[in-house]
Regions:
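Helix-breaking motifs and short loop linkers at transmembrane-helix boundaries and internal kinks
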Residues: 45, 77, 98-104, 295-297
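Conserved MFS/SLC helix-loop-helix module at the cytosolic interface between two early adjacent transmembrane helices
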Residues: 64-100
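Helix-to-loop junctions at the C-terminal end of transmembrane segments
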Residues: 65-78, 262-274, 358
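Primarily marks hydrophobic transmembrane alpha-helices of the MFS/SLC 12-helix fold
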Residues: 79-82, 105, 278-279
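Paired small-residue
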Residues: 91-92, 103-112, 300-308
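Helix-loop-helix hairpin linking two adjacent transmembrane segments in secondary transporters
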Residues: 104, 133-134, 138-187, 236
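Cytoplasmic helix-loop-helix junction between adjacent transmembrane helices
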Residues: 108-146
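C-terminal transmembrane helical hairpin of 12-TM major facilitator-type secondary transporters
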Residues: 276-320
């Protein structure tokens, strides 16, 4: 292990917050088109389905890049890597703000994909290096809380800016946020040297880790099922639930608040009953994406299903990462990079599949198919015996 448990003088929690702010910023950038899809489509004359590539493209490149980061970085200080990726994040959002065509916006989003893969591949494994062992669970919730916090403040703020000043200003605002995050990171994050480089053998050694492989499968199903529907949440709320455009921002804010609550609730629950926590998350997601298009034909019911959706999805990232840490305690960066790769591949596949379904069959059919994917994840969790997981963990992972 490349441990660096900071003492009190190293400001471990401020450093952890800086890493969490980095994840918040990159997730805000990644999810921004979700709240801006309608004005982007209008400005650049594209179909909703094609514009969905603004979500799937960066996710696809993040999936490809995440494992390559930990392989290629070798012994490079992780602090230096984070600084470099934040600089790239600033450039990607400036390019997006200046884009005059969908093709140029796609290029900016591909550049963002490299930032996502790089930042998450590193950030996911930093909790145990920045804080004492007893505080790792809380540090994970802070770092992965950036996902839910981006839904609360990032995406709704993007919607407000997009409505008031145009969607380009939303991307410009994220570039400014990335610059401020970079300054904080330079001030509070300690050097994070690596004494043992990760090799290709480190990855191939995990082929026999059944618990890790199951976690990766669950990651793909839960995230793909979510993003099949969530990529089109704005048109879903407006056309199915009959919610006016001016209320979409506040509703997404409420969705994000529910997500933050779900993140910390799931973080605590997963520490005690991980499998059961993930099963409840899968059930909540399935109910939300199935029932919103089928029964959410009024603003009140549509909003209620959206809040359920937020609570359930808020617990996804922290619970799945907890699964990875338990599955491969002696290969944290390997497990983290594989997790991020599958997570973003699932975003790409889910949003791409959702775009195809929406363009050909409509929003309701897309919601039903999304729910079926999530129910498959639930079925796998129900059929997987806890005893089998415990046995697999002992057999596949060396003692931590």
């Amino acid at each position: 292990m490349n441990a660096l448990h900071a003492d009190g003088g190293a400001k471990p929690w401020l450093a952890t917050f800086a890493v969490g702010l980095s994840t918040f910023t990159v997730v805000t950038a990644e999810m921004l088109p979700v709240g801006l899809l309608t004005p982007i489509v209008s400005t650049l004359n594209a179909s909703i389905g094609r514009a969905g590539l603004l979500i799937s493209l960066p996710a696809l490149f993040a999936a490809l890049f995440a494992p390559l980061v930990v392989l290629g970085a070798r012994r490079t200080d992780r602090r230096s890597l984070l600084v470099g990726f934040l600089l790239l994040l600033i450039a990607a959002n400036l390019l997006a703000a200046a884009a005059t065509s969908l093709a140029l916006l796609f290029a900016a989003r591909i550049l963002l994909g490299f930032c996502i893969g790089g930042i998450w591949a590193i950030a996911g494994g930093l909790a145990e290096r920045l804080v004492p062992p007893a505080s790792v669970g809380l540090a994970l919730s802070v770092i992965f809380g950036g996902v839910a916090a981006a839904s609360v403040f990032g995406v709704p703020l993007g919607v407000f800016l997009g409505e008031a000043l145009g969607w380009r200003m939303a991307f410009l605002a994220v570039a400014v946020l990335a610059a401020l995050t970079l300054l904080l990171l330079l001030c509070v994050l300690p050097s994070l040297p690596v004494t043992q480089a990760i090799s290709w053998r480190s990855f191939t050694a995990q082929r026999a880790n059944r618990r890790l492989l199951l976690g990766l499968l669950l990651t793909f199903l839960l995230v793909a099922g979510h993003f099949m529907a969530y990529t089109f949440v704005r048109p879903l709320l407006q056309t199915v639930a009959g919610i006016e455009g001016r209320w979409v921002g506040p509703l997404l804010f409420a969705y994000g608040v529910a997500g933050i609550a779900g993140n910390f609730i799931a973080g605590q629950a997963a520490a005690k009953r991980l499998r059961r926590t993930l099963a409840l998350i899968a059930l909540g997601l399935a109910l939300a994406v199935l029932l919103l298009p089928l029964l959410g034909h009024a603003p009140l019911s549509g909003s209620a299903f959206l809040l359920l959706w937020g609570i359930a999805y808020g617990g996804v990232s922290v619970s799945l990462m907890a699964w990875m840490l338990k599955a491969a305690p002696d290969a944290v960066e390997v497990a983290s990079s594989l997790y991020i790769a599958l997570f973003n591949l699932a975003i790409s596949c889910g949003s791409l599949a959702g775009g195809l379904v929406v363009d050909t069959g409509g929003l309701t059919i897309n919601g039903v198919l999304s729910g079926m994917v999530l129910l498959l994840a639930l079925a796998i969790l129900i059929r997987t015996r806890p005893q089998a997981l415990a046995t697999a963990a002992k057999a596949d992972s060396p003692p931590g």
